[in-house]
């Protein structure tokens, strides 16, 4: 339906290139999906979400193992000419080693972070609120964690880093860029305000002036200097 319905609908509404987010439960499934999307002119980039469980690897997320993440990267790069951005999970002990493994495997960029693992318990039933016990925790509360990981990864790789995780203001975008992000994605905030992206774009010039920034591109990684 993405190819037959969603892409035509998006083209009619925006007529812009889109980034397709790809998930999979096996390396073959990732490769199959990316190969199908490779022929779609409207898809400008592929963002490969390696936070999915590897059904052939004991259920462990591809994104928690440098070797598995690299295998997915290589498989996808073999079937597409489009830029491939690997989206990393924060639920790891060493996100830098995973980012570097993806870079070595041919990734064109790294995006981070996906949701943090969290849970809640219903005090009436004394049971987890989520049927699967744990689930993805997102929103502004995870911004400091995302910022830290963007800072760490951008220091270690030589490919573009896309920052995300709790971004909800022009100031957050500027912080992400100072941490090393060359681009910024917005997720959960769209569910609160569907117009948040437009508002942030419109607010950026004023925020840049406030903090004496002439060109946003000039501040990328600025927090690393000195």
Where are these regions (language model features)?
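C-terminal helical cap(s) of enzyme catalytic domains, especially alpha/beta-barrels
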Residues: 121-135, 177, 189-213
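Hydrophobic/aromatic residues in well-formed alpha-helices
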Residues: 2-3, 69, 173, 219
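Glycine-rich, positively charged N-terminal anion/phosphate-binding segment
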Residues: 1-14
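Extended, intrinsically disordered, low-complexity segments
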Residues: 143, 202-226
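Alpha/beta enzyme core
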Residues: 12-13, 25-162, 168-186
């Amino acid at each position: 339906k993405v190819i037959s319905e969603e892409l035509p609908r998006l083209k009619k509404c925006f007529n812009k290139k889109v980034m397709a987010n790809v998930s999979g439960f096996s390396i073959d499934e990732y490769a199959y999906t990316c190969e199908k999307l490779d022929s779609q002119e409207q898809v400008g980039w592929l963002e490969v979400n390696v936070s999915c469980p590897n059904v052939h690897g004991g259920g462990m997320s591809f994104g928690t193992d440098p070797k598995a993440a690299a295998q997915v990267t290589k498989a996808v790069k073999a079937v597409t000419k489009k830029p491939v951005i690997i989206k990393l999970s924060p639920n790891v002990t060493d996100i830098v080693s995973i980012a570097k493994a993806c870079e070595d495997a041919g990734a064109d960029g790294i995006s981070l972070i996906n949701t943090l693992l969290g849970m809640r318990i219903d005090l009436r039933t004394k049971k987890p609120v989520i049927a699967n016990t744990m689930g993805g925790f997102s929103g502004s509360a995870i911004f400091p964690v995302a910022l830290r990981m963007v800072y760490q990864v951008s220091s270690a790789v030589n490919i573009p880093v896309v920052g995300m995780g709790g971004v909800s203001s022009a100031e957050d975008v500027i912080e992400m860029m100072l941490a090393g992000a060359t681009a910024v994605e917005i997720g959960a905030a769209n569910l609160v305000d569907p117009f948040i992206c437009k508002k942030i774009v419109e607010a950026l010039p004023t925020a840049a002036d406030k903090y004496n920034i002439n060109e946003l591109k000039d501040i990328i990684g600025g927090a690393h200097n000195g």
